[in-house]
Amino acid sequence: CKVVDFAASRKTAALAEQLIDETLGDPGVVEVGSDDAGRWTIGLREVPRDGSDTGLALNSDSVFVVTGAAGSIVSAIVADLAAASGATFHLLDLAAKPAANDPDIALFVSDRDALKRNIFERIKAGGERATPAMVDRELASIERAEAALSAIQAIERAGGNAHYHSVDLTNSDAVTTVMSEILANHDRIDVLVHAAGVEISHMLADKPREQFDLVFDVKSSAWHSIMRAIGDKPLGAAVVFSSVAGRFGNGGQTDYSAANDFLTKCVMSFSNARPETRGLAIDWTAWGGIGMATRGSIPTMMAAAGIDMLPPQVGIPVVRRELTEGPIATEIVVGGRLGVLTAEWDEAGGLDVGAIDMGDEHGPMLGRVVGMSLAKGLTVETELDPEAQAFLYDHRIDGTPVLPGVMGLEAFAELATLLLPEHHVESIDNAQFLAPFKFYRNEPRKLRVTAQFAGVD
């Protein structure tokens, strides 16, 4: 499957031809954009933070609106934002506003096993047969109440103002009412953090329609309701919580993946539709220590898939840093090793390498194409023989043939031209000569050269 995005002005005939080309080739790419400047796709690259403070100034005058505030991860992030700003926070969640003196919350913090026993006995006392699933549901409700209370208390400790709104985010009228109340008291919203989400994993064929709608609407309908309510009022930044499931897809999470990707595309549109608002989508990997992914067999499954769980101390400051240190990109992936999510499904990147005719019009440094992928780029392999190539036979160190540095540069130039035949090489910059490539005993050696596209923001 592929998604192909064309400019609205593209003529139908050319569009049809390109769609056919996309169907027949380049199976390693699933998202493609096409305009007059060329063909574009999306890849991953690591971008270090520079620690600058060119982003938003968060202070006691700042106004935050946060959805999904009763989630343990969101609660921890709110606490971090509050400590850095002392701002005003409007917290939205389906969970009822927690009472500071709730004994269940206190017991959840001090002795979770004792709380489970209490819940079990309460269910029995009500005349029902207590099951582990019933206990876990009640415990999850108390856990969300504790997370909401923790967020409120963290804001208050930082000298900020916490306003908690219990609201069904899939109810457009209810969300509009809450947002109208918020906007009646403030002339702007500095930061919207849309972090609400529900994840119910089932294969699409086995998933009831109402379940799909719930998972999708918590993110999408809530977003529409909130943005309609904000209208043309100032909004400094909108941060949406997406997932690696939204970026890469995941089995049994079609609805969750689609909803997350929808939010990402919404904030990406801000560059044209709302340029005064900074949009940021964070594709989180699974968190370790807190959150939904810590339960049951999920950590074991993640390890088997080669996916690192995100340590809370690494993940919690991300939102604050992205807001205050200025934009690097509209969409970022936060995680460690991503395992199967970024694995190459075809060793050659979908190319029929045996059918590629390199022709005779190339230099001595290109042999045969080995493969092509987003992660590794275009790779060629060539065999060099000191007995056949004079530039090796005549270039020796202590009698051993050594690949001349200039021929290494020639390999780069030849491969770049193969990758982009409509361009020419103008210069080679930042070359480093780290170690000699030697041909011991005058024997042939195989050389692999890889070319990757430079990232474009």
Language-model features: where?
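Structural preference for long, well-ordered alpha-helical segments in enzyme cores
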Residues: I73, I77-L81, V215, I226, ...
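NAD(P)H/NAD(P)+-dependent Rossmann-fold oxidoreductase cores
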Residues: S9-S242, S297-I316
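Active-site helix of classical SDR
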Residues: A258-A259
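Phosphate-handling active-site elements
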Residues: T88, N272-G279, T417-V425
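Flexible, glycine-rich beta-alpha linker
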Residues: C1-L19, A96-A100, I200-S201, S243-D255, ...
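Acyl-thioester-processing domains in fatty-acid/polyketide/NRPS systems
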Residues: L15-P27, M309-D457
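Active-site-adjacent bridging/hinge elements
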Residues: A195, L235-S242, M292-T294, L378-D394
